[in-house]
Amino acid sequence: MKQYLLILFSIFSFPYVWGDAIGTWKVYPSYSDASDIVPTGKNVFVLASKSLYSYNVNDGSLRTYSNNDVLNGCNIQNIAWVNAVKKLVITYSDYTIDLLSLNGDVENISALADKQTTDDKNINSIYVDGQYAYLATGFGIVKVNAKDATIADSYNLGYKVNYCYISGNSLYAASESKGLMKCQLTANLLNKNEWTSAGDYKKQNKEKYVYDSTNKCYWATDSDSKLTKYQKEGDTYQAVSTGVKPDGPEYNEHNYIVYDNGRILSVRGRFDYVSFDTSTPGFVQEYAIDSDTWYCYDNSYSMDKGKNCIAQTQISVDPKDKNHIMVAAKSGLYEYKDRKMIAYYDMNTDDPILSVINKVNYSVISGTRYDASGNLWMFNMGNDNILCLTSAGEWKSFNQRNLSKDDSYRLKSLFFDSRGLLWFVNDSWKAPLFGFYDIKSDAMRVVSSFTNTDGTVILEKKNIFAITEDRAKNIWVGSETGCFYITPDDVNAMLSVDGENTNVRPTQHKVPRNDGTNLADYLLSNVFICDIKIDRANRKWFATSNGVYLISSDNNTQLAHFTMDNSPLPDNDVRSIAIDDNTGMVYFATLNGLCSYQSDVTKTYGDLTDDNVYAYPNPVTPDFTGDITVTGLTEGAQVKILATSGQLVSEGTSTGGSYRWNGCDMKGKKVASGVYMVNVATAEGESGIVTKISVVR
């Protein structure tokens, strides 16, 4: 094999090209808030922000663990080391249990999660005795045999157990509601009557510094949440190592994300219209994709002025300066430059922003968007004016009779379409509507009558959350009961009528059943849709309360439905989607974490050139099992892959700017080792280019 590979490369010159294989996932967990540190001798395991990593004491290396590699879940609640069998017990918020060995093998116990019961199955803490792990749960105690990965016993006590332990010959259950209860180990632990009171409940406090008996030291996290080694000198602890932790976001909460200039920008959201909740401060995070590095934006400007930054909901990037962004929030408008806040605007600053009616303590900027000239447009809840902060720094107001000071108008999800119209939705069930503002004519058009082309009322007192334009210039709208779109002709009709347009009939797409009945079903009917994004192939990505749906360009085929059950999604409630059109990477934001999926659609090019067209991975090594991707193609490019003998092994049309080959010939058989020629021509067949793929079996 090695000799063949050497001969192959001596004949043909192949740059080693690798990209993320189509269908692969990445997760981006936070490690900022350590809750458990577990020394095991060679390794120190750390549970931080519901994610797991380990530090190798001998070589100083870090390893992360996730549901994208070895683990069977995410949102970890507890960890504990069972030294007798050298396994780490991991419990999750969905009540599943993993047993992780030092070699990376994982055994899963799903019996508790699978148990059909109305009891509270939440696992509050773990106590280890010998080869057994005792789980304190919402209904009692579960005894796990870590040696053979089974549940040995389950003691339903009928009340929440905060923690448990063994002392002497008794098992103790500490409960906030029942106090401290105990039962002799030789008694019938299944019998609730055998459990007797042993005193009052005392809260269990975790030690900040965890002693490592093997390495004769203490472990804790420093002020930057980094794992640090300490030695105790008298009553004080002295750091004797530099702190370490994996890179990641500060928080796992991602309510809104946007792709811009090779980075993902994220805000936490948590917008509560009812109360002015300050428990979730605003926070901007940036992921630099090429360097795989996370940055946290500096909010000290507002903090120094005693101004709370609350519930940031939308990010707008200045088209003239990518390092200048504006963020809409429940507490006003925030301006950042070079990852630092430099200004904020609200009802108390010199601008036309108003406070929410009857709530004078805060002002809501519900949505923002820059136009191509660098002017920032925004809606201010409780204000019947559209506001604009020009590129010169001048504030302007445009009164609109379709707006109201009523707090039922929460206009958001702003974007400019291909015509230059500023679209928005109102996510209040009191007044569901969508529409646009024409900045050239200072005219607003809205649709609040939602009767579809069949004459059926499709929205009545329902929330609308998402709006976007597809590549056929249809405007798609997502609500808590599904999706619909209006056509370019509908938009023209809206432009021809002043004010509210009741003649527009949104289209609910019908998907044929193809079962001989001539019946059809509405696309994603009764699905709660939070966001919609369109990729280069005009496919629709829907973020919903039940995962992510990918729908074909003709809207008739569900190409994928990702959930926590079949993907590394950290939560089924997906709030936002961002697409890197250059690479085809699709990012999914949830309040429990961020992840990405490598799709098969990339940027399309105007011409076929040697610089743009290439295949990856190249060479295709024996251990590779995915699809090979040819990228850098024009829209609708015709692709033929041939062996050196001239035999055709694959042909087809590009999807977006890429073409997928499964490495098989026309009969579905894996091709042999060799060099394969990729002939590419435009959709019109007017020009072509050849690249090569090396396959090594």
Predicted regions and their residues:
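Short, conserved beta-strand segments of beta-strand-rich sandwich/propeller modules, principally
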Residues: 585, 672-677
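Sec-dependent N-terminal signal peptides
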Residues: 4-13
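C-terminal tail/sorting-segment detector
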Residues: 677-697
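Positively charged n-region of N-terminal signal peptides that target proteins for export
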Residues: 1-4, 697
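Short, glycine-anchored, charge-dense loop/turn motifs used at functional sites
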Residues: 638-649, 668, 676
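Glycine-centered tight-turn motifs at strand-turn-strand junctions
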Residues: 648-671, 682-686
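Carboxylate-rich, polar loop motifs that coordinate divalent cations or form catalytic acidic clusters
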Residues: 3, 18-613, 648
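Glycine-centered coil/turn sites that cap beta-strands in beta-rich domains
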Residues: 607-640, 658-661
